[in-house]
UniProtKB/Swiss-Prot annotation:
This is Putative pterin-4-alpha-carbinolamine dehydratase. It holds the Pfam family Pterin_4a. Keywords: Lyase. It comes from the Bacteria.
Length: 97
């Protein structure tokens, strides 16, 4: 099982991810796209890196707005896996915006 990060580690990591914010025991990114199709295209691009990492985000889509939430459920909070995948998602989101 992945090890939970301390508050100090979380604050350090989130500082390097300006697109993300800490919400309780999760990190979250909200991104708006041109339209619904662009939002869905972006979400589809997340499948491969999530599968490769063995770590899957919670995703909510509302027309052109995508909300991505990461936490490590089996650890009960935030782990390095969350921040590693958040970094990849941030890089992909810059291509699609």
């Amino acid at each position: 099982m992945a090890q939970l990060l301390s508050d100090i580690e979380i604050n350090s990591q989130i500082g390097q991810l300006p697109d993300w914010s800490v919400v309780g025991q999760e990190i979250q990114m909200v991104r708006k796209f041109k339209d619904f199709i662009a939002a869905i295209d972006f979400v589809n691009k997340l499948v491969e890196p999530a599968e490769a990492a063995g770590h899957h985000p919670d995703i909510a889509i509302s027309y052109n707005k995508v909300t991505i939430t990461l936490t490590t459920h089996d650890a009960g909070g935030l782990t390095q896996k969350d921040f590693d995948l958040a970094q990849v998602i941030s890089q992909l989101s810059r291509i699609w915006v």
